[in-house]
């Protein structure tokens, strides 16, 4: 308000050279404009809730690695955290190349593996010599790996992450198989018809180009 008022006063003084000719109504308009700007930021979040969209402002805030959930991941699953940072940079660069929304895919990449925080030691990037999968069957190991999708969605719900971020969590493996455990099981049971659903991620497959970039 003050900036608008001072600029208007200066320009009018230059052009009119007469203070009595100043249009005082303009100051009222400047004041109204200042009030609207003051409420614009909180209104943005209200509109997001009502209409179900996520603004770039929200995505930028979520991508701050000092927020509580990402900070927790860096402590509980440091290998996964580093992997997510690398994926965020790579996926954002790839999205830029194909005309995708780089900020969206960057933020989605930061959160896509948050479910690994529930059982961090079962994922290679967090292991330090001991592999807990050795005490499990191939089917059990596959279910632990697959569960990082459902666990991630539960954490996303708990922390009120927007739907567009949840979609990255659910789609980043699509309907693919946990191939290592599936192939290992098949090799040990060559005469058995294997139920692929025991080794399959719940999906769905990616349905936006940003999700497809992250999956690749």
Across the structure, where does each feature detected by a protein language model lie?
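Divalent metal-dependent catalytic cores for phosphoryl transfer on phosphate-bearing substrates
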Residues: 70-216
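Generic detector of multi-pass transmembrane helix bundles and their immediately adjacent loops
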Residues: 1-81
């Amino acid at each position: 308000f003050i900036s608008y008022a001072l600029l208007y006063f200066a320009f009018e003084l230059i052009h009119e050279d007469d203070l009595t000719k100043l249009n005082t109504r303009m100051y009222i308009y400047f004041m109204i404009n200042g009030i609207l700007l003051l409420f614009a930021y909180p209104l943005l979040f209200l509109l997001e809730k009502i209409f179900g969209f996520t603004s770039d402002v929200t995505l930028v805030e979520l991508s701050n690695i000092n927020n509580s959930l990402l900070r927790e991941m860096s402590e509980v699953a440091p290998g996964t955290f580093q992997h997510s940072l690398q994926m965020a940079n790579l996926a954002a660069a790839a999205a830029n190349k194909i005309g995708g929304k780089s900020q969206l895919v960057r933020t989605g990449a930061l959160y896509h593996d948050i479910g690994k925080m529930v059982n961090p030691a079962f994922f290679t990037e967090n292991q330090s010599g001991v592999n807990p999968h050795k005490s499990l069957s191939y089917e059990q190991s596959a279910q632990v790996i697959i569960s990082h999708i459902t666990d991630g969605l539960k954490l996303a719900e708990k922390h009120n992450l927007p739907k567009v971020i949840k979609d990255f969590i659910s789609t980043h493996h699509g309907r693919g198989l946990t191939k290592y455990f599936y192939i290992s099981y098949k090799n040990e049971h060559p005469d058995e018809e294997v139920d692929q659903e025991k080794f399959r991620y719940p999906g769905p497959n990616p349905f936006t180009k940003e999700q497809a970039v992250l999956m690749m």
